């Protein structure tokens, strides 16, 4: 049966002459080709009329002009399969019928001296509005001129939207098919011109977008750049604080080692044989070379703590009278800093005194050793002649 249906479709297609698409704009044909490809989802090259009726009927297609389906039924063969050429011919027939019917109604309703028939003239919808098929909109009441002549046209910019053939030849019953379809892009441009001129007359109308211009979208839920910047700054601060904490721990260990060394030296000097022990062990590296750096570190640390205390007090005062500030914390910190400075000064002075004392003891030791050797040499010289005389 399928073979018979295919043979029937081939016989009918050869019997009836295929409609032509000559005289139609290329852009219009491309748009219709896209629509036909959507309907022909199986890529067979033809679409059955029942499929089009099932898609273009119902609640979703209530705005579809009624003449479109009748035009497709007229050009459809007996088997109901529509090729692209027949599909274009059906749409062409529906457009011509709709245009001719509107002109007939306008000609019957027209009276001498009455310009109300211009209200019934239709224009094509702008190209930027979404649509599946061609639709037409009636002109507003403001489009009717107050008086005949060129002055009325110049005072009413809406008359620019009226097709040239309809304005010049109201008694014409039927226009050529190619001219009727070629008016589609010109009508779109005329609608755009009417909207642009409408802004000058006080009508709030939005200018249409140009052909090919895409609609712009704004990202509202994207990544916040300021939040990323703040997170990066916080990470840097955390890294710096961790490095400072590590250096403070190492510095604390070094300070404790130096204190233990100083206390050990004090203990040795307090004993009776401190000089001899020190001379036996050797002189360690003196702290006097590092004293300027130690003092500089203590000064920088004190300035840092002072600036940090003042920096924490500023936001609380700028927020307003939320509560009385606690003066005990800054005073306690200042006292701690002063105490550390005093201890550092005392330790430095003590180390300096001890170093001078050690130097003095070493000099005395050297002098005593020299005197001892001199005394031994003199004693040996004095005892030599006495021994020879006795023998």
Swiss-Prot record:
| InterPro entries linked to this entry | Suppressor_APCD_1/2
The UniProt annotation puts the region (Disordered) at 1-20
Keywords assigned by UniProt, alphabetized:
Cell cycle, Cell division, Cell junction, Cell membrane, Coiled coil, Cytoplasm, Membrane, Mitosis, Nucleus, Phosphoprotein, Tight junction
Superkingdom of origin: Eukaryota
Q: Which parts of the sequence carry Phosphoserine? A: 283
UniProt keyword Cell division, yes or no: yes
Any Gene Ontology biological process: positive regulation of cell population proliferation
Coiled-coil residues: 226-277, 340-381
- Indicate where the modification Phosphothreonine is found in the sequence: 218
Expression sites by tissue: Expressed in the retina. Expressed in retinal progenitor cells and newly differentiated neurons but not in mature retinal cells (at protein level).
Single GO cellular component annotation? bicellular tight junction
Q: Localized where?
A: Cytoplasm; Nucleus; Cytoplasm, Cell cortex; Apical cell membrane
Q: How does it assemble?
A: Interacts with a spindle orientation complex at least composed of GNAI1, GPSM2 and NUMA1. Interacts with GPSM2 (via TPR motifs); this interaction is required to prevent GPSM2 anchoring at the mitotic apical cortex and is inhibited in presence of NUMA1 in a dose dependent manner. Interacts with PARD3.
Protein's name according to its UniProt entry = Suppressor APC domain-containing protein 2
């Amino acid at each position: 049966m399928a073979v018979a249906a295919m043979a029937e479709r081939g016989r009918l297609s050869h019997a009836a002459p295929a409609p032509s698409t000559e005289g139609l704009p290329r852009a219009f044909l491309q748009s219709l080709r896209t629509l036909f490809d959507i309907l022909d989802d199986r890529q067979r090259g033809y679409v059955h009329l029942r499929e089009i009726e099932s898609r273009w009927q119902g609640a979703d297609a209530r705005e579809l002009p009624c003449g479109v389906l009748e035009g497709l039924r007229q050009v459809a063969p007996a088997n109901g399969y529509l090729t692209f050429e027949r599909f274009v011919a059906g749409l062409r027939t529906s457009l011509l019928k709709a245009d001719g019917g509107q002109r007939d109604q306008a000609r019957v309703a027209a009276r001498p001296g009455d310009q109300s028939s211009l209200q019934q003239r239709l224009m094509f919808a702008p190209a930027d509005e979404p649509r599946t098929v061609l639709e037409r909109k009636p002109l507003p009441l403001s489009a009717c001129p107050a008086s005949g002549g060129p002055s009325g046209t110049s005072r009413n910019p809406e008359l620019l939207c009226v097709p040239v053939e309809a304005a010049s030849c109201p008694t014409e019953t039927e226009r050529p098919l190619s001219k009727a379809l070629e008016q589609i892009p010109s009508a779109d441009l005329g609608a755009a011109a009417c909207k642009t001129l409408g802004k000058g007359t006080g009508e709030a109308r939005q200018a249409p977008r140009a052909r090919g211009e895409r609609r712009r979208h704004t990202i509202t839920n994207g990544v916040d750049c300021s939040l990323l910047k703040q997170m990066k700054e916080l990470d840097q601060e955390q890294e710096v604080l961790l490095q400072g904490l590590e250096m403070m721990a190492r510095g604390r260990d070094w300070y404790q080692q130096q204190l233990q060394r100083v206390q050990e030296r004090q203990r040795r000097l307090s004993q009776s044989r401190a000089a001899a022990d020190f001379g036996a062990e050797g002189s360690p590296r003196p702290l006097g070379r590092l004293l300027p750096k130690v003092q500089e570190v203590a000064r920088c640390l004190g300035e840092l703590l002072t600036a940090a205390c003042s920096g924490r007090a500023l936001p609380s005062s700028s927020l307003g009278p939320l509560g009385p500030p606690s003066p005990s914390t800054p005073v306690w910190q200042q006292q701690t800093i002063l105490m550390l400075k005093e201890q550092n000064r005392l330790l430095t002075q003590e180390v300096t005194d001890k170093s001078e004392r050690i130097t003095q003891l070493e000099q005395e030791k050297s002098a005593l050793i020299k005197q001892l050797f001199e005394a031994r040499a003199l004693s040996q010289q004095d005892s030599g002649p006495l021994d020879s005389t006795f023998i």
